[in-house]
Regions:
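Aromatic- and acidic-residue-enriched segments that line the glycan-binding/catalytic groove
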Residues: 1-19, 172-189
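Histidine/acidic-residue-rich catalytic or RNA/ligand-binding cores of hydrolases
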Residues: 123-133, 174-183
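Aromatic-rich peripheral "rim/lid" segments of glycoside hydrolase catalytic domains that contact
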Residues: 165-230
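Glycoside hydrolase catalytic-domain groove-lining segments
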Residues: 23, 32-47, 51-131, 151
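Surface-exposed substrate-engagement region within the catalytic domains
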Residues: 132-152
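Short glycine/proline-rich turn/loop motifs
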Residues: 17-30
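Conserved residues at the C-terminal ends of beta-strands
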Residues: 89, 162-165
Length: 230
């Protein structure tokens, strides 16, 4: 089939012989093929987007896997060739990894945007059995998580935005939805449109001073840099 023929051609060219033995495939070969595969995918998608929709930014495919994607210099190097902004769904950490964020910029040369992150409150009355976000005890804790997480994004200097996932809680009465997206407190409003005011107040507190916070963090960073060069 076409896929096998393409892989075989790539592998033979990499090994420099025809019908290179499959039993000699190494981890380095697997890594190289992953990079080749991703580059091919990104190139084809980008060519079509640039042709038919040249005036919009391409945000990519929302990286999510820690070791396979978010800690991979090769993946980010490819992403930097094609994406305008690199999109990332950020889970499984209480705050973004500062070293990773610095590496993303170094590896790709592009800014990033966080396209998903959230926590679920145990005081919501929902079971919170589904979803990638972790559980916290209260809506206030959700708000403090938000403030800390976003502050670290701003501290990085290379984040251009963030999206809380999601606007509304899963409706526990709607059994037609996917079971993995049915019973959790992900939203800033409940499934009946009642706002989580404690959470929203904490979010607003940070959002209202975002630019002042950026200036403060940049000044602190510049001050630290001056000290290291003295």
């Amino acid at each position: 089939e076409d896929a096998y023929i393409a892989v075989r051609k790539w592998y033979d060219e990499r090994k420099g012989v025809k019908d290179a033995p499959a039993g000699e495939i190494t981890d380095a070969d697997r890594k190289a093929f992953q990079d080749f595969y991703f580059d091919t995918y990104m190139r084809k998608v980008t060519e079509v987007l640039r042709k038919y929709d040249p005036n919009h930014l391409y945000l990519g495919c929302r990286f999510n896997q820690h070791h396979q994607e978010m800690a991979s210099p090769e993946i980010f190097a490819v992403a930097g060739k094609y994406m305008d902004v690199i999109s990332i769904n950020h889970y499984r950490l209480w705050e973004p990894n500062a070293a990773w964020m610095a590496d993303w910029e170094k590896w790709s040369g592009k800014p990033f945007i966080i396209t998903e992150f959230y926590t679920k409150g145990e005081d919501s009355g929902l079971p919170n059995n589904t979803g990638a976000g972790w559980n916290v005890r209260t809506q206030a804790d959700r708000g403090w998580f938000y403030q800390n997480f976003v502050t670290e994004l701003l501290r990085s200097g290379n984040c251009v935005g963030w999206h809380w996932f999601t606007y509304m809680d899963n409706d526990p009465q709607n059994l037609r939805t996917d079971p993995s997206n049915r019973d959790s407190n992900k939203g800033v409003v409940a499934w009946n449109f009642e706002p989580y005011t404690v959470l929203l107040d904490e979010m607003k507190q940070l959002n209202d001073c975002t630019y002042r916070l950026i200036r403060h963090l940049d000044a602190e960073k510049a001050k630290a840099n001056r000290k290291t060069t003295e």
